[in-house]
């Protein structure tokens, strides 16, 4: 009881497959779920006690195994068959029935020895009476078939009785038959070794006695069954042996086994048993038509004998068991494979049609994404997206970048949503600009100095006025006496501070004036009393109104004798600027910067206007402001002039401006004094940035340098993506335009200046010179001196270098001379613009213009051999030159145009003939000259093309 065994171990001992053993266990009522299930000794004994059920199961599942066992019993009969020679099937049946009860125990041991021998039909004759050897082989087969029928009624006892019958009948067995028996036994062991073990166990326990009793009770039935079975079995074996592939048909024949009685003589008693046994024995034995043929004709049986005998030998080698297993298991495997093959494509189609959840149909992208990446995230083929974009009129490729708006529209076509998850620098800057000590409430804000921008037309005295206020001389330091930089200054007036921004008045510095108007609180519009309103004056008014900044008009140069302030006021009324004394709200102050008159009144008006505006700021926040100007200093690096608008900027604060970031290393005011901190409305020069920021950009002080770097890196990446997106977009029209531009001349320039604002001014002024015939392309701009990299770039791109208020390094100058690069230096923007205009005009091809010289009238023609027609002419106007071009006109229609071949006067060659003289001339390669024709004389001259 204590010893247990697993199913697979028991199967190995019994030589049976795990599946077969599991089926036997289930039929025996033993619960075993898998090959790893544990069986007790009681279960094993229970399995041994139910051999009949196991045999029946084996007959259904493994037909080959059951057939072989019974065939093994047949060879024992075959041993007795050689002496018997009866051919009648009825006698065979009776003999078997009589001998069965006599020897029931012996057949059990003989069953494993029985082998299926080729001639089944002869066995019937052997049982009835001794006959020739070939016939004896046939009855052996018949007995084997009879056994399964007996087993159907009584499982093992029937087999035992049959074996006994076989032993009684045989007198002597042939040696070759005995040799075949062991081979069949080996096959039966391989396929159904369990059945033999179960039979031996049953015999040892005494089941043989019970079998004898059951057999004796059913003797008449057994006899009929054996007779029928003998016939059927012999025929079945022949068919199986002759055609091994027909084993699949055996099952069919077994199901139709009731048809066999048609050809069998003893159909009375055994017929019903054959039907009962058919479901079990039908599986092991082949169909009925084969036995019918044997009964009807011996010739067919003999043919079947020979073929089946040879094949039986082949089957006896051990292939039979394998084929039986294949019949049982392989069809199921094939069906499974076919099922799997059919099912596999279905889930694939379903996955294509499946719709993801709504939350999964949201695609998060940055500002720009490529077509391929968008298709990958959407799970859509790239070609589908490209097709949709082409339908919308965009010619793209898989690597084409899409902006957020285009991606959103495209994704909506495929039922997807696009969410922009780009780095939100505004939130970061808003968080870092949080109040450190006090909130943005009224209590935390304090009055701040006003920011005043001085604007006006060039040479109207803006800088001179600021110099008079600051008591300095800025104009003297400017090249050409005009301001070319934007300056920020801090002035104290009656213990109050005013921040002044001085902007250039030249037309090239429009962007500077626009920046000055944006960051200012009050605008002082300077108008010369002797000039009145000029173009830049109008522009300054427009900038101020666009920024919503109040304007104070300063009428300058009142010291001149031709000054007329009323004319200025009258002209400004056109721009809705009416003086207060005329009932308006615009403040007018008449000043003289040269004589420093009425400056206090101007400053008083500025402070009054600032009080009205109630300018306040919170100094307790992180600093925020604007870049007024930026330049590259050789000793200090990038230097930025900043105007703090909110908060307080301190040394060491990390700041970010445009594409650059860094920590504040030093701060100095306009007088060169070092500062530790700068409050609202305080202009300072800052060093420590990674590069020169663009003038007009805003700057922010952030919490850490890491945040500053993150913001700057994000901006740089965004700029690169936008450049890539802009350069890759091109339509067919643009492509055609570019092809046409192949004939357009280009002048490439590199601009280097001392400050960023000057770079922008020079660039904008030069770009305006571009025309359809000649275009100016600025390939590089930077702040600082001209270095070797600039020269190398110019050499590679055939460009010229313009230096504005900068000089070239010694190595760069030497390299430029070697490479033949043209470097030009300027201090005044006028000179740079004029020189570039001349250079662009030099690139253009000269224009050809026709110059009229005179007219002649043909009065006579002469024909000279080998020369042609000579026209005698009279010069009616102008003159005729020998190498001039002429045009022959007849009846006001141009007949011919070409050159003069010769020009003579009185047989002498003439260089020219003046008006009122006669001459003779001939045309080059043309002789159809008639009297009355008019010849026009002209020449083509080249004229320089201007922009």
UniProtKB/Swiss-Prot annotation:
Disordered, as annotated region: 69-353
Bias type Basic and acidic residues, positions: 215-226, 246-262, 327-337
G4: annotated segments: 556-559
The entry's keywords: Cytoplasm, GTP-binding, Initiation factor, Nucleotide-binding, Protein biosynthesis
Residues reported to bind GTP: 456-463, 502-506, 556-559
Entry GO CC: cytosol
Statement: the UniProt record of this protein carries the keyword Kinase: no
Biased composition (Low complexity): 81-108, 264-284
NCBIfam families, sorted: IF-2, small_GTP
UniProt-recorded name of the protein: Translation initiation factor IF-2
Organism of provenance: Syntrophotalea carbinolica (strain DSM 2380 / NBRC 103641 / GraBd1)
Lineage: Bacteria, Pseudomonadati, Thermodesulfobacteriota, Desulfuromonadia, Desulfuromonadales
């Amino acid at each position: 009881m204590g010893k247990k065994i697993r199913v697979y171990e028991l199967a190995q001992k019994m030589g049976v497959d795990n599946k077969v053993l599991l089926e036997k266990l289930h039929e025996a009522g033993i619960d075993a779920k898998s090959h790893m299930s544990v069986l007790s000794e009681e279960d094993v004994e229970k399995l041994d006690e139910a051999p009949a059920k196991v045999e029946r199961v084996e007959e259904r599942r493994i037909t080959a195994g059951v057939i072989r066992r019974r065939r093994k019993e047949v060879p024992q009969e075959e041993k007795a068959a050689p002496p018997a020679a009866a051919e009648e099937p009825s006698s065979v049946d009776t003999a078997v029935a009589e001998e069965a009860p006599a020897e029931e125990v012996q057949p059990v041991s003989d069953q494993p020895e029985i082998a299926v021998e080729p001639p089944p039909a002869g066995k019937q004759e052997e049982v009835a009476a001794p006959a020739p050897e070939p016939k004896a082989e046939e009855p052996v087969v018949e007995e084997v078939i009879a056994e399964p029928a007996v087993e159907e009624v009584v499982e093992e006892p029937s087999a035992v009785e049959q074996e006994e019958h076989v032993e009684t009948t045989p007198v002597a067995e042939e040696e070759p038959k005995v040799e075949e028996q062991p081979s069949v036994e080996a096959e039966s062991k391989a396929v159904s070794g369990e059945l033999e073990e179960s039979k031996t166990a049953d015999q040892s326990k005494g089941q043989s006695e019970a079998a004898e009793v059951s057999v004796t009770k059913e003797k008449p039935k057994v006899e009929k069954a054996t007779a029928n079975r003998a016939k059927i079995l012999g025929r079945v074996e022949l068919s199986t042996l002759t055609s091994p592939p027909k084993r699949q048909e055996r099952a069919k024949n077994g199901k139709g086994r009731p048809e066999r009685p048609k050809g069998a003589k003893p159909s009375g008693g055994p017929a019903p048993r054959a039907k009962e046994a058919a479901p079990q024995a039908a599986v092991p034995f082949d169909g009925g038509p084969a036995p019918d043929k044997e009964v009807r004709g011996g010739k067919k049986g003999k043919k079947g004998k020979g073929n089946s005998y040879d094949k039986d030998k082949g089957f006896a080698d051990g292939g039979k068991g394998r084929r039986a297993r294949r019949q049982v298991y392989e069809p199921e495997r094939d069906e499974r494979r076919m099922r799997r093959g059919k099912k596999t494509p279905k889930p694939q189609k379903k996955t294509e049609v499946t719709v993801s959840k709504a939350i999964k149909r949201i695609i998060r992208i940055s500002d720009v994404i490529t077509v391929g990446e968008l298709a990958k995230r959407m799970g859509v083929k790239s070609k589908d997206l490209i097709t949709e974009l082409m339908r919308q009129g965009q010619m793209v490729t898989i690597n084409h970048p899409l902006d957020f708006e285009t991606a959103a529209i495209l994704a909506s076509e495929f039922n997807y949503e696009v969410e922009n998850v780009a780095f939100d620098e505004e939130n970061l800057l808003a968080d870092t600009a949080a109040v450190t000590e006090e909130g943005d409430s009224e209590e935390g804000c304090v009055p701040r100095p006003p920011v005043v921008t001085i604007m006006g037309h060039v040479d109207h005295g803006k800088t001179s006025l600021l110099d008079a206020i600051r008591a300095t001389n800025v104009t003297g330091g400017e090249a050409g006496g005009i301001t070319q930089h934007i300056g920020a200054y801090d002035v104290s007036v009656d213990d109050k501070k005013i921040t002044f921004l001085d902007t250039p008045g030249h037309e090239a510095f429009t962007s500077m004036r626009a920046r000055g108007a944006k960051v200012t609180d009050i605008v002082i519009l300077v108008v010369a009393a002797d000039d009145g309103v000029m173009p830049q004056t109008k522009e300054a008014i427009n900038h101020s109104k666009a920024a919503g900044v109040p304007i104070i008009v300063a009428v300058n140069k009142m010291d001149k004798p031709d000054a007329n302030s009323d004319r200025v006021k009258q002209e400004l009324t056109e721009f809705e600027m009416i003086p207060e004394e005329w009932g308006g709200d615009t403040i007018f102050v008449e000043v003289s910067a040269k004589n420093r008159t009425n400056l206090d009144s101007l400053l008083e008006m500025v402070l009054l206007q600032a009080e009205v505006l109630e300018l306040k700021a919170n100094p307790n926040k992180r600093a925020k402001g604007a870049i007024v100007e930026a330049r590259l200093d050789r000793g200090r690096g990038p230097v930025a002039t900043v105007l703090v608008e909110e908060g307080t900027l301190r040394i060491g604060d990390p700041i970010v401006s445009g594409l650059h970031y860094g920590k504040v290393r030093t701060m100095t005011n306009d007088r060169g004094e070092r500062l530790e901190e700068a409050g609202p409305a305080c202009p300072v020069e800052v060093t420590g940035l990674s590069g020169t920021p663009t003038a007009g950009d805003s700057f922010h002080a952030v919490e850490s340098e890491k945040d500053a770097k993150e913001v700057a890196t994000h901006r740089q990446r965004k700029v690169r993506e936008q450049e890539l997106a802009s350069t890759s977009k091109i339509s067919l029209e643009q492509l055609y335009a570019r092809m046409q531009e192949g004939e357009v001349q280009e002048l490439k320039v590199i601009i280097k200046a001392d400050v960023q604002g000057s770079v922008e001014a020079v660039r904008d002024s030069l770009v305006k010179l571009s025309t359809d015939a000649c275009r100016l392309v600025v390939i590089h701009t930077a702040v600082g001196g001209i270095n070797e990299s600039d020269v190398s770039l110019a050499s590679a791109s055939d460009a010229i270098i313009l230096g504005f208020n900068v000089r070239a390094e010694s190595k760069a100058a030497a390299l430029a001379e070697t490479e033949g690069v043209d470097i030009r230096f300027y201090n005044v923007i006028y000179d740079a613009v004029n020189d570039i205009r001349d250079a662009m005009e030099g690139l253009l091809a000269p224009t050809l213009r026709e110059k009229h010289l005179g007219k002649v009238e043909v009065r006579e023609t002469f024909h000279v051999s080998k020369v042609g027609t000579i026209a005698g002419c009279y010069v009616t106007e102008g003159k005729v030159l020998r190498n001039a071009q002429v045009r022959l006109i007849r009846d006001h229609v141009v007949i011919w145009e070409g050159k003069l071949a010769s020009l003579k006067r009185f047989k002498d060659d003439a260089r020219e003939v003046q008006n009122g003289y006669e001459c003779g001339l001939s045309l080059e390669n043309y002789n159809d000259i008639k009297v009355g024709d008019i010849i026009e004389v002209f020449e083509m001259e080249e004229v320089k093309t201007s922009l």
